[in-house]
Amino acid sequence: MEYFIVPYLLWFLYVVFMVLYLGIKDQEEGNKLIAFLIIGMTVFLVISAIFPNGLRLRPTTFARDNIFVDMVKKLYSVDTSTNVLPSIHVYNSLGVMIAVARTKLLKNHKIMKNGLLLLGGSIICSTVLLKQHSMLDVMVAFILGALAYVVCYREELATRTSLSSAEIE
C-alpha cells in the first residue's frame, strides 16, 4: 500500500497543472473549477474552525522497509492527522476530475483524459490506503462535491433538465 504515496504526492501537481491549463486554454471550465475549489476549501476551513477533528489510523510500525515506506513515514512526520473532514485531497481531485471530463480540450485525447481520471481516482484511493483519511472523510468530500457541482454547474443542469422535459412531451 505504501506505493500509493506516489499518487498522493502527485495531487499537488495534478490540481495546480489543471487549474493553470484550463485557466489558460478553457477559461470557462477553468473558472468553474476554481469556483468549485474555492467553495470546498472555504467549507473545509469553516468546518475545521467550528468542529476541529482528527484521526488515529496511522500505523506505528511497517512490514516492509523501502523508499516508499520512507516517504510515507516522512509524510506522517510533516502532515498531522488533524482537521481531515472532509478530505481536501478527495474534494479537489473530484473537482479536477469533473473539469477533465467536461472540457472540450481533451475530447480527442482519450488516453490523456483517461489517464488524468485514473490519476484522480488513484489519489482518492491513496487517501484511505495511506491512512490519511477515513471513509467518512471521503464520503463527506463526495457529498460536498455534489453540492458544489450543483452550484457551479447549475446553468448546464437547468438546460439539461429542460431539454429532457421537452423530449418527454
Predicted feature residues:
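Membrane-embedded alpha-helical segments of multi-pass membrane proteins
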Residues: 7-14, 88-95, 139-143
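Hydrophobic, membrane-inserted alpha-helices
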Residues: 14-18, 93-99, 118-126
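Membrane-interface loops
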Residues: 23-107, 111, 159-168
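Aromatic-anchored segments of alpha-helical transmembrane domains
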Residues: 41-49, 118-128
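Interfacial helix-loop-helix junctions of multi-pass membrane proteins
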Residues: 58-62, 80-85, 122-149
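Short hydrophobic alpha-helices at membrane interfaces in multi-pass membrane enzymes
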Residues: 108-121
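C-terminal membrane module of polytopic membrane proteins
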Residues: 140-169
